Design a protein with these regions (language model features):
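Charged, low-complexity intrinsically disordered terminal segments
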Residues: 1-244
Length: 244
């Protein structure tokens, strides 16, 4: 069966919304960006367009009564949107993002990596670190880093995918080889149970439309004072190669 990804989104208003827009524009207007027309070649004829539209309309119609859409309709967020009364949690927020220049720079230019912006928060940890990272590949340096945090008295808990729940087994292999050393260092590890899709929460299924679940959310909670929600995984490819 298809996997249902357990993800996490955040709704932000005010200055951070403008910052996200600025980051998007930086990529949209970058020299490496090019229009879709550069890939499409010649424009499709009317028959092709009509056929694609018919396929699209049929797909949309088939999803109208899906478990997923039904869950959205019944969600508290949906009700709040309909009532025009979204309950927000107010707090200080900051947008951090890789710059497009990262794509053109040498791989060892760590000052261009998003991880360098987050490093001060990790270095300042005093009590607790909770990590959700579906594609978690700490490497030897990561094992040492988390082990040192534990020695400093920081309670480190990491949630990632199990072999049965991951959609990228190769990445899981990169994590599994360090699992024993992480546990020996005092790190608490929790792996996603793909059968969690059948569990209920508040009368609504946590994952719908599939009998198998996979973790996809990326977030870090630091000392219960700071939270990072984004696209960054704790693995070398995400830190060095990707733009997050």
């Amino acid at each position: 069966p298809a996997l249902a990804f357990g993800d996490l989104d955040v709704l932000g208003i005010g200055p951070i919304a403008r910052k996200v827009s600025e980051s998007f524009d930086a990529y949209w207007n970058h020299a490496l960006a090019y229009p879709a027309s550069a890939l499409a070649g010649q424009a499709p004829d009317e028959q092709t367009v009509a056929r694609l539209r018919a396929r699209h309309d049929a797909f949309v119609a088939a999803q109208t009564d899906s478990d997923y859409l039904q869950a959205l309709r019944n969600s508290s967020l949906s009700r709040q949107l309909q009532e025009g009364n979204i309950r927000l949690v107010w707090g200080k927020a900051e947008v951090v993002a890789d710059a497009p220049e990262k794509l053109l720079a040498e791989r060892d230019r760590s000052e261009l990596h998003l991880s360098s912006l987050l490093a001060p928060y990790f270095r300042g940890l005093e009590r607790e670190l909770i990590i959700f990272s579906p594609y978690f590949v700490p490497g030897k340096e990561g094992v040492e880093f988390f082990g040192n945090l534990v020695k400093k008295g920081v309670h480190v808990r990491i949630v990632t995918n199990s072999l049965s729940s991951t959609d990228v087994p190769v990445v899981h292999a990169g994590y599994a080889r360090h699992r024993r050393n992480l546990l020996r260092a005092g790190v608490e590890l929790y792996e996603m149970n793909r059968q969690i899709a059948t569990e209920q929460r508040g009368g609504m299924r946590t994952f719908t439309g599939s009998s198998k679940a996979s973790l996809h959310a990326k977030s870090f909670v630091l000392d219960r004072r700071h939270v990072f929600i984004g696209s960054l995984n704790l693995d070398p490819r995400s830190v060095i190669e990707n733009t997050e």
